[in-house]
Amino acid sequence: MKKLKIALLSYRSDPFSGGQGIYVKNVSEALLNSGHDVTIFSGKPLPLVDEKIKVVEVHTPGYFETFNSLERFKIFQAQEKTRLNVWDFIETFTGTFTEPIFFGDRLLQNTEFAKTADSFDVFHDNQSISNYPDSITKKLVTTLHHPIHVDRDIDLENENSFLNKLSIKRWYSFLNFQKKNLKKVKRVISPSKSSKKDICRYFDYPEDQISVIWNGIDLDDCKFHQRSAFNSEFVTIISSDVPMKNLKNILKALYLLKNDGLSARLTIIGDLREVNKKLIEDLGLSDLVSFKPKLPRNELIEILNASDIGIAASSYEGFGFPLVEMIATGLPVIVSDKASFPELAGDAGLIFSSDDANDLKEKMKELIKNHALREELANNSKIRRDAFFGWDEYAKKLEDLFEEIISGNV
């Protein structure tokens, strides 16, 4: 394929937290390795990428680096009082997450973008779904990892206060803008079939304009590990302890397992909220649960190799990187019945009802007691590992979509 000039658009690209910055890094470097010229236009936090990739900062006020109202007002005072800045502040101050709403407007005000916009062959948006002009949307591909409507609905389900529910709805009101803006996009990339289905449902977007491409994942350091001794060591990975990660039901299942007279330990990789720390104490699980904050890659792999069974319990994931990593190391896994997990796990895992701690307990018990089943799932994990691919192959799949956009066949 000929060398393309590609603009990656991302309203924020934190390299250390959440998936968006990691996605931008991996995609941009894979496209660079494929011989393309890549420029990233991003709000803060900026991505950390290969020095051959040009990164252009799109100015954003930084209101969401703090949740202190006085600090936000000070940020506003330091801004030029343009119509855009005033509108952004009012929306922020009244509880809306505004970064994706106004990213498109701020991009158009960026001097570097104004000078170079016409030179790009294709624009690739990373879930900003902002209000881009026709000059961009006619050459635009958007990656939509999953509909954030799901996060909103789960947050609402886990909140009892009427006022807090109103606040949650206000925060997620940017979704109304995104639904309108997505209709102008020629092609959407979804990381799983389940996410594609939900994009159609929540955004009322045409199914035939959504391409499913599993995310690339670097498995070079996730070697298949043959386990010998079995010690009932379970492991789960959470990027952040939010209700969607469903940690509460994992802890309840461990408690039920203990009451059934079975001994098992759980390692939680990630940050813990106080509510779940308290739940561990209240259930008398302190001696059975250990938790590690975000770890260097090598330490993460060591813990996976020292574990016997992995649990991926989220109520929703557009694509579960931790699940794939567990499968790649040969762990038998237990996964929730929601979203992409059954699709990714294939026959390498058991499936439980995500809102049923007793069902999870039964699956844990089954794997503890059934050595032959553990061996079967571990062998299936070894086979399933080959279904996943790296970011260079992902870039090749992107090239096919870019060619469709450029040739006008979409």
Task: Identify the role of each PLM range.
Residues S194, G216:
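Carbohydrate-associated surface elements
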Residues S228-K245, L251-L254:
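Conserved donor-binding/catalytic core segment of Leloir-type glycosyltransferases
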Residues K277-I301:
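Nucleotide-activated donor-binding/catalytic signature segment of Leloir-type glycosyltransferases, i.e.
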Residues P332-V335:
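Short hydrophobic beta-strand element within catalytic cores of glycosyltransferases
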Residues S42-D105:
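A conserved catalytic-core segment of Leloir-type glycosyltransferases
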Residues L350-A357, E366-A372:
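Conserved acidic donor-binding segment of nucleotide-sugar-dependent glycosyltransferases
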Residues R72-G95, T137-K179:
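Acceptor-binding helix/loop patch of EC 2.4 sugar-transfer enzymes
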Residues S315:
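Aromatic "clamp/platform" in nucleotide-sugar-dependent glycosyltransferases that forms part
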